[in-house]
Curated annotation (Swiss-Prot):
Widely expressed, with highest levels in liver and kidney, followed by heart, spleen, skeletal muscle and placenta. In hemopoietic cells, expressed in dendritic cells, but not in monocytes, macrophages, granulocytes, nor in B and T lymphocytes. Keywords: Acetylation, Mitochondrion, NAD, Nucleus, Oxidoreductase, Phosphoprotein, Transit peptide. Belongs to the short-chain dehydrogenases/reductases (SDR) family. It is found in: Mitochondrion matrix; Nucleus. Residues 1-23 form a transit peptide. Its main location: mitochondrion. The active site is at 185 (proton acceptor). Disulfide bonds: none annotated. One of its GO terms (cellular component) is cytoplasm. Pfam families: adh_short_C2. The gene is DHRS2. This is Dehydrogenase/reductase SDR family member 2, mitochondrial. The modification N6-acetyllysine is found at residues 96, 219.
Length: 280
């Protein structure tokens, strides 16, 4: 089944003029740009979520990280605190209301308000077709990937209003280019694009901007079906416009920008971080 997923990605890349210079993912030093701000990042103990949490903390924010497993929270906390970053952590299954309440309480322990919410948590428990997916799996994917960001935001909203804050949802390039055998996951990530635009409209009067980051193929545990296959991974890189596959840090910088004053006039956008254009 995993090979079906891999085949589904092969149609994404189109021949074009390639850049001869490898692009840097390290970004520019923006230390302090988010000083004295508070960020909550879900699904943030590994991969893209962890990179985002680290970047926000490096840029001055106090960051609350979360994961479903205590051992993952402890490991991520040790790494970030070892770098001298201001972080707190808590176990949170975003699909559970009581866990979301505890996450909110943890964030409020520090300063009584929250400036940024980054929803990076997501699941895909099944590799298979859309119509072959059980109702139970449908409910699980949509609950975690789509409902939980909105419900968590509703719980945080009283503490985010009028702070010139930002909400960042993390979708997937599968929202634009569906992947074979990731049926319901594709649907859930497409739904986030609409959720972003709707929330942006609703929350603008409260001085909260809402945008969405849409990662392409990023080297994480989620994509190990690709980078674990050396020949397939090499083929992807050779046919990619930038001749490389993304790193988690490639997504982190754009999230920090979207939280910063530099993005104060950016709202309701779905921004692809894929190394190629997804649309006109």
């Amino acid at each position: 089944m995993l090979s079906a997923v891999a085949r589904g990605y092969q149609g994404w890349f189109h021949p074009c003029a390639r850049l001869s210079v490898r692009m840097s993912s390290t970004g520019i030093d923006r230390k302090g740009v988010l000083a004295n701000r508070v960020a909550v990042v879900t699904g943030s103990t590994s991969g893209i979520g962890f990179a985002i949490a680290r970047r926000l903390a490096r840029d001055g924010a106090h960051v609350v990280i979360s994961s479903r497993k205590q051992q993952n929270v402890d490991r991520a906390m040790a790494k970030l605190q070892g770098e001298g970053l201001s972080v707190a952590g808590i176990v949170c299954h975003v699909g559970k209301a009581e866990d979301r309440e505890q996450l909110v309480a943890k964030a409020l322990e520090h300063c009584g308000g929250v400036d940024f919410l980054v929803c990076s948590a997501g699941v895909n428990p099944l590799v298979g077709s859309t119509l072959g997916t059980s109702e139970q799996i449908w409910d699980k994917i949509l609950s975690v990937n789509v409902k939980s960001p909105a419900l968590l935001l509703s719980q945080l909203l009283p503490y985010m209003e009028n702070r010139r804050g930002a909400v960042i949802l993390v979708s997937s390039i599968a929202a634009y280019n569906p992947v074979v055998a990731l049926g319901v996951y594709n649907v859930s990530k497409t739904a986030l694009l609409g959720l972003t635009r709707t929330l942006a409209l609703e929350l603008a009067p409260k001085d909260i901007r809402v945008n969405c980051v849409v990662p392409g193929i990023i080297k994480t545990d989620f994509s190990k079906v690709f980078h674990g296959n050396e020949s397939l991974w090499k083929n992807f890189k050779e046919h990619h416009q930038l001749q490389r596959i993304g790193e988690s840090e490639d997504c982190a910088g754009i999230v920090s920008f979207l939280c910063s004053p530099d993005a104060s006039y950016v709202n309701g956008e779905n921004i692809a971080v894929a190394g190629y254009s997804t649309r006109l």
